[in-house]
Amino acid sequence: MEDMKPSTASTKNLHHDGVGENDTIEVRFTDFCKIGLSVSEDAYEEAIKLFKGTKHLLLANISAIGNGMPEEAERFWFAFVSYSVKRLSEKIRDNMQQRPDDNGLTLCQILRRAKLNIVDFFKELPQYVVKAGPILSTMYGVDWENRLEAKELQANFVHLSILSRHYKRAYRELFLTSDANVDKQSATAYMSDYHRFGWLLFLALRVHAFSRFKDLVTCTNGLVSVLAILIIHVPVRFRNFNLNDSQRFVKKGDKGVDLLASLCNKYDTSEDELRKTMEKTNNLIADILKKKPHMASEYKNENLDNINTDGLIYYEDLMEESSLRSSLDILEKDYEDAIRCKGELDERVFINEEDSLLGSGSLSGGAISVTGTKRKFDQISSPTKTITSPLSPHRSPASHTNGILGSTNSRMAATPVSTAMTTAKWLRTVISPLPSKPSPQLERFLASCDRDVTNDVIRRAHIILEAIFPSNALGERCVTGSLQSTNLMDNIWAEQRRLEALKLYYRVLEAMCTAEAQILHATNLTSLLTNERFHRCMLACSAELVLATHKTVTMLFPAVLERTGITAFDLSKVIESFIRHEESLPRELRRHLNSLEERLLESMVWEKGSSMYNSLTVARPSLSAEINRLGLLAEPMPSLDAIAVHINFSSGGLPPLSSVSKHEISPGQNGDIRSPKRPCTDYRSVLVERNSFTSPVKDRLLAFTNLKSKLPPPPLQSAFASPTRPNPGGGGETCAETGINIFFSKINKLAAVRINGMVERLQQSQQHIRENVYRLFQQVLSQQTSLFFNRHIDQIILCCFYGVAKISKVNLTFREIIYNYRKQPQCKPQVFRSVFVDWSSARHNGRTGQDHVDIITFYNEIFIPAAKPLLVEVGSAGITVKGSQVPEVNNNKDGQCPASPKVSPFPSLPDMSPKKVSAAHNVYVSPLRTSKMDALISHSSKSYYACVGESTHAYQSPSKDLTAINNRLNGNRNIRGSLNFDDVDVGLVSDSMVAKSLYLQNGSCASTSGAPLKTEQPDP
């Protein structure tokens, strides 16, 4: 294009790229390694090699790291490189069974030297992983990211943050912080030592007993066992409880308080699991501290008064002043030996209260998130949102009768730990008692197919679940102490999780078959029950719910996709149906599935290797060349036999797989999306199910623009039909076309919510801004679909915002857009810092290959050349374009460019009262900012391009802004839509969706400018 394109060169001026400065940076890194970290010469040589290989990335991205200052960016990069070398070289040595050649360097030591905190480190690490990935792959192999285990370490940090707070609260409830009989200083020391002893004993459990599967539920059981040890052994004068307290110790008998049963009742733990954990804890005390165990029933001590001592162990002098300090020293040394040379997190940091090292701010890990150490309890869980909050839909009768809501804690404010334990109780009380084989009703469905598929279903389930929950020591992580005992516990844990997932799979499969039979008025469900991909999706969904319940650190999503051979696009087809057909599913698991669906839609289905691209080549043949050029197509789904061989599966005790069934479930058959040439022979498999492409949460929060289908609810099995099959209900469309259209409608719905949230946060009251951003997004998705390839939909939304702002002459800079986007619940910094580009397809100043750039570079170089015609069309809906002048906004016209396809108006989102929003969500009032005149580009083109440092939005006075906010909070509005909290099937209103839907307008214009609503309707 002839237009001048302002670049981000101003940001690059922050770094120095002279040879002398490069040498200086290397000198500083050398000092960091040799003086600061005292690494060995071999470790230094490896570190300096990686640093030299990635130094150019640091210099090119200084402004995008941390606060953008060179000094801080440098410290981050030093930490990234040091941590990478430590973890990856350690894994190589482990595989070669070599001894480590440096001291026991941990992540905490690296961060202390770099003057960084843990939260900030994990926030910035993803862009280093993206940028340095090719270099790390060259040095350490293609599996470097799995061996780095950065995501697992982050999830581990989040879990430990939550557990440490849980332990601290519980300890303060049970024990005094001072003793009236001793001086204050001594009492503080006692409290600190007892508190520290409990945490170190818990860490010993994690190291020696929990091993690979350090899930939140198991760890909570460990903490409760530690509390039991403390209650029995901490001197009575430090107690903050009375054993006669009927609310705290509810389990009593003739022999006194049943301590373990009472703790289980309070913390929703399994008594059987707690007793097993207590046994491990007692063994550790005997083995590590060399304390002699006594049967508590045979020992007299005031600590044991009024306690039923049957089955309890007592250790003499365990908590007495004479031995407490030596016990602490032994536990400290044991832990140091355990983590030596592993480069992992020093988990003692949570008891040391090193706030400067822990950091502050939000951080997510797995299915939960945490805010920094300064966060108060009422911020962990909003005081207005309890387990029985009106924000939660009423559960089905089944969930009320399973005992989940019947606990004494049902009205306590929910914490991450209590929520996890409540969910685990559902799994324990509702799912675990079920049979581990198909029920008679399910067997009838399986036997009613063209041939009996019962054996196939059973064998497949065992193979896939064995792949997800391996029982052998493959992939064993850091194991210290007794390897045999830890492997045994791993195997027991894996077997328990397999059984839970298996029982849940059979239960939901039966419910789905019953529903399908009612729709079809037949019991022959051959097309569905012989579909390999469908069953794998169901098994993956069941396993993911089990993993999410236990909050497992070492198998984070998308592990279930990788181990079952399916893709994100496949899984998205069953999520909604799974929720609808398991009425007792707890609130948190519904929330988890809905959040997964959002993750799938926003980025994962657009990643390389997604089966969505295989359908897209059928539905949009014009995109085939670009899809093939970028190598985006999914590989064939691995066969069941291949998975069985890979995991060394033993089929002993399982029914054999018939030769017929082997043929029928091989890749490419039964709806395999990668083999679309199968002829249509079964009408039941032709229709595409509407419900399999919509989420219950989004159905309620995004109640607008119903899908085009006028047919009654079609069968589930059709969602997995071969893409080239004709869809008789789709107006001549193939199943791929219908499926992609419905998939695109889901993307548009998600974008609508996020656009609306950004408009409200930006305080852009003009209705046409929201309408035009949404219109442009739809046009880009429909006509420039390749802009989404390998990208995040938020990247396109941000570009649409800026493009519409420029064409509409609204003073809104990219800097301000990103500043407000950072406050969105779904924001991740890498979204605007690292956007995928492929330079080989266009004229880009001689640049070739693939790269990741910042959002402004992507906007100028990629987005605008592709989307400028669409942007002009969107701007011309109500404006007049004259020559090369920037289009002027004319709100008196409400037309649509004849050349553009009709698009849906901005949907009518449900109105949400601010009073129903968590108190943790703030209403932001941005300060006044000054504006600048941009003279870097010509007048004719500056409507399209972005520059760093452009003027920000000119707000009204603070008094007017506050008045407007008060009017919204207190004003009377006509509400045309409402949330139905009585419909069990509609799912859950998650916090993030509530936050994003704050002050929604129900389609009414919030502008004071009088701009009319757009009235275009979708195609009939």
Curated annotation (Swiss-Prot):
<feature type="compositionally biased region" description="Polar residues">
    <location>
        <begin position="398"/>
        <end position="409"/>
    </location>
</feature>
<feature type="region of interest" description="Domain B">
    <location>
        <begin position="738"/>
        <end position="869"/>
    </location>
</feature>
<keyword id="KW-0678">Repressor</keyword>
<dbReference type="Pfam" id="PF01858">
    <property type="entry name" value="RB_A"/>
</dbReference>
<keyword id="KW-0131">Cell cycle</keyword>
<dbReference type="GO" id="GO:0000977">
    <property type="term" value="F:RNA polymerase II transcription regulatory region sequence-specific DNA binding"/>
</dbReference>
<dbReference type="GO" id="GO:2000134">
    <property type="term" value="P:negative regulation of G1/S transition of mitotic cell cycle"/>
</dbReference>
<keyword id="KW-0539">Nucleus</keyword>
<dbReference type="GO" id="GO:0030154">
    <property type="term" value="P:cell differentiation"/>
</dbReference>
<dbReference type="GO" id="GO:0006357">
    <property type="term" value="P:regulation of transcription by RNA polymerase II"/>
</dbReference>
<keyword id="KW-0804">Transcription</keyword>
<dbReference type="GO" id="GO:0005634">
    <property type="term" value="C:nucleus"/>
</dbReference>
<protein>
    <recommendedName>
        <fullName>Retinoblastoma-related protein</fullName>
    </recommendedName>
</protein>
<feature type="region of interest" description="Disordered">
    <location>
        <begin position="382"/>
        <end position="409"/>
    </location>
</feature>
<keyword id="KW-0805">Transcription regulation</keyword>
<dbReference type="Pfam" id="PF11934">
    <property type="entry name" value="DUF3452"/>
</dbReference>
<dbReference type="GO" id="GO:0000785">
    <property type="term" value="C:chromatin"/>
</dbReference>
<comment type="similarity">
    <text>Belongs to the retinoblastoma protein (RB) family.</text>
</comment>
<feature type="compositionally biased region" description="Polar residues">
    <location>
        <begin position="382"/>
        <end position="391"/>
    </location>
</feature>
<dbReference type="InterPro" id="IPR002720">
    <property type="entry name" value="RB_A"/>
</dbReference>
<feature type="region of interest" description="Domain A">
    <location>
        <begin position="415"/>
        <end position="616"/>
    </location>
</feature>
<dbReference type="InterPro" id="IPR036915">
    <property type="entry name" value="Cyclin-like_sf"/>
</dbReference>
<dbReference type="GO" id="GO:0005667">
    <property type="term" value="C:transcription regulator complex"/>
</dbReference>
<feature type="region of interest" description="Spacer">
    <location>
        <begin position="617"/>
        <end position="737"/>
    </location>
</feature>
<dbReference type="InterPro" id="IPR002719">
    <property type="entry name" value="RB_B"/>
</dbReference>
<comment type="function">
    <text>Regulator of biological processes that recruits a histone deacetylase to control gene transcription. May play a role in the entry into mitosis, negatively regulating the cell proliferation. Formation of stable complexes with geminiviridae replication-associated proteins may create a cellular environment which favors viral DNA replication.</text>
</comment>
<feature type="region of interest" description="Pocket">
    <location>
        <begin position="415"/>
        <end position="869"/>
    </location>
</feature>
<dbReference type="InterPro" id="IPR024599">
    <property type="entry name" value="RB_N"/>
</dbReference>
<dbReference type="InterPro" id="IPR028309">
    <property type="entry name" value="RB_fam"/>
</dbReference>
<dbReference type="Pfam" id="PF01857">
    <property type="entry name" value="RB_B"/>
</dbReference>
